[in-house]
């Protein structure tokens, strides 16, 4: 279990769900992870549902933007990366070949953010914190534990994020298919990059939540109306599973060693 009051630039710091049915998602995740969910008015009639464990924020549930819903885009978990200057980082991302879908904007007094699509096609968010630093609890059951990019171009993706965020990438010895472990500029492990699987799958950042009972959590996903896409899988140092909530959002579960 690790409490957080700040994040080093380049670190994954928050995740939220864009969904077509907030109330159904609230019921699913509160039962699955024991989240305590608080409805927060976010302007223009929008409710941002903040999820907590033991009084510490861990994630949120938000309504899917109308344009995505009308285009038939499935619900998805978003990955936020803390930066010092979101305006400068968004400009740099564009220079490196990314698409800035939402230029930097203020989120009330919580922070300032931008929505980016990397050159290979994966979406992510840049976050400059004000009153909301991000998750107050990580690497604990029900909390964010890892972020993993599935990409059709490992080298291209690694170079983009190195140039944008100062990350380092290290090939995991003996991994087949290849796997790059990502670290922030100060040397902390921060995620991974792997080939998109199966081939042809659109690139995306997969969000992992920790669990202390993987088999039990997988069973609960199914009992609550979700789908188990990949059951208990031994990856050597941990066990993982990939699942889908009843509205269609994909996320992963992790059971293994957790850093402080």
Residue ranges and their predicted role:
Residues 1-8, 11-20, 49-51, 66-92, 94-145, 149, ...:
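Vicinal oxygen chelate
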Residues 2, 36, 47, 65-67:
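Short secondary-structure capping/turn segments at boundaries of alpha-helices and beta-strands
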Residues 7-9, 13-56, 95, 101-111, ...:
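Core segments of cupin and vicinal oxygen chelate
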Residues 41-42, 53-54, 61-70:
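Conserved donor-binding loop and adjoining core beta-sheet/short helix segment
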Residues 55-63, 188-193:
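Short, flexible domain-boundary/linker segments around small modular repeats
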Residues 57, 67, 132, 187-188, ...:
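Active-site/binding-pocket entry motifs
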